C-alpha cells in the first residue's frame, strides 16, 4: 500500500521493531506464520513483512463487511426470537446479490485504477471510478426496487413458514434500500486497493461496522423495531460508508490521516464507452463466479 506519514504502521521498520510497536493480533498472526515459512526457507523474510502489511488490512476489512449478518442475526435473536433469526437468514441471500454485482464489477475498477495509478494518470483513474459507479448503480437500483416492492413474494420462494416469511419480508423490504450503497462501497474499497492503499478502506469499513452495531442497538432495543430495525441499521451504516468514500475521493484526504492516493473530479465524463466496456469485460466473469455462490446460498 502507499504508506503515508502518520499511519499507525510503516513498512520501513524491521521485523523486531514492528512486533514491539504494533500489537495487532491479525498482523502478528500472519507475521508469525510467514516468519515460520521464512525460517524453513520457503519464502523471503522481506516478502513476508511486505505481504503482511498489505494483507492484514484487507482481512480486517473483510471481517468488518461480513459482520453485518452476524450482528443482525444476534441482535434480532435476542430481541425477537427464533422466527426473526430464521427470517433474517432467509433474506440474507437476496442481500448477497448486491455483493455479487458490486464485488464483480469492482474487479474491473481495481484493474483500471491500478493501471492508472501505475502510469500516474489521474484522468484515467477518475474515469474508471465514475464509470464503475454508473454501472453499479444501473444494476443495483432495479434490484433494490424489486426487493422493496415484492419482499414477501421473494422470501416465500424459499421460506415455507408464514411467520418466518413475513419476518424475512419485513427485513428485506427495508434493507433493499441499502443494496445500491453496498455495491458502491465495494467499488470504493477496490479503488484504494488499486491505488496500493489497503489502510483507508479498512478504516472506513471498520467504522461502518461499528456504526451498524450502534444503530442496531438503538433501533432494535430502544425503539423496539425488531427485524426492520436491524435492516435500518444496516442501511444507515452502508450510507455512512458510501458518504465517507465519496468525501474522501472528492477531497483526496481524510482528516487525521493526511493525503490519500486518489482524488476524483466529480464533473468529468461518466458514460465513457471504452471504460464501461473494459469494466464489463473484466468484471462480468467475476460476477458470474460470485453468482454461483449466491445461488448456492438459495
What residue spans do the PLM features occupy?
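Short alpha-helical transmembrane segments in multi-pass integral membrane proteins
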Residues: 2-55, 113-178, 220-283
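Transmembrane helix-bundle signature of multi-pass secondary active exporters and lipid flippases
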Residues: 56-111, 175-182, 277-298
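Hydrophobic/aromatic residues within transmembrane alpha-helices of membrane transport systems
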Residues: 60, 64, 72-76, 88, ...
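Generic alpha-helical transmembrane segments of integral inner-membrane proteins
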Residues: 63, 67, 71, 101, ...
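Short loop-to-helix capping motifs
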Residues: 81-82, 161, 196-198, 226
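Small-residue-rich hydrophobic transmembrane alpha-helices
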Residues: 85-148, 182-201
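Hydrophobic positions within alpha-helical transmembrane segments
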Residues: 88-91, 95, 171-174, 201-204, ...
Amino acid at each position: 500500500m502507499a504508506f503515508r506519514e502518520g499511519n499507525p504502521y510503516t513498512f520501513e521498520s524491521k521485523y523486531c521493531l514492528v512486533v514491539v510497536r504494533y500489537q495487532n493480533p491479525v498482523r502478528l498472526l500472519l507475521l508469525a506464520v510467514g516468519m515460520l515459512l521464512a525460517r524453513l526457507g520457503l519464502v523471503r523474510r522481506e516478502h513476508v513483512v511486505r505481504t503482511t502489511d498489505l494483507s492484514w488490512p484487507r482481512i480486517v476489512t473483510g471481517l468488518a463487511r461480513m459482520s453485518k449478518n452476524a450482528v443482525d442475526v444476534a441482535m434480532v435473536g435476542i430481541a425477537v426470537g427464533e422466527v426473526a433469526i430464521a427470517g433474517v437468514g432467509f433474506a440474507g441471500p437476496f442481500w448477497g446479490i448486491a455483493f455479487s454485482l458490486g464485488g464483480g464489477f469492482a474487479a474491473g475498477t481495481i484493474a483500471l485504477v491500478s493501471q492508472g495509478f501505475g502510469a500516474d494518470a489521474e484522468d484515467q483513474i477518475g474515469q474508471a471510478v465514475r464509470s464503475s459507479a454508473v454501472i453499479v448503480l444501473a444494476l443495483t437500483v432495479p434490484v433494490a426496487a424489486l426487493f422493496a416492492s415484492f419482499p414477501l413474494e421473494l422470501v416465500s420462494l424459499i421460506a415455507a413458514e408464514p411467520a418466518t416469511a413475513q419476518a424475512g419480508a419485513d427485513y428485506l423490504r427495508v434493507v433493499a434500500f441499502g443494496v445500491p450503497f453496498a455495491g458502491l462501497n465495494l467499488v470504493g474499497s477496490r479503488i484504494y486497493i488499486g491505488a496500493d492503499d489497503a489502510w483507508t478502506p479498512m478504516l472506513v469499513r471498520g467504522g461502518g461496522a461499528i456504526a451498524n452495531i450502534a444503530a442496531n442497538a438503538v433501533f432494535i432495543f430502544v425503539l423496539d423495531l425488531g427485524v426492520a430495525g436491524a435492516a435500518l441499521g444496516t442501511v444507515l451504516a452502508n450510507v455512512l460508508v458510501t458518504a465517507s468514500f465519496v468525501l474522501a475521493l472528492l477531497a483526496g484526504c481524510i482528516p487525521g490521516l493526511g493525503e490519500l492516493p486518489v482524488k476524483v473530479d466529480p464533473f468529468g465524463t461518466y458514460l465513457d464507452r471504452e471504460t464501461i466496456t473494459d469494466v464489463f469485460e473484466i468484471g462480468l466473469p467475476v460476477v458470474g463466479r460470485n453468482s454461483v455462490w449466491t445461488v448456492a446460498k438459495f
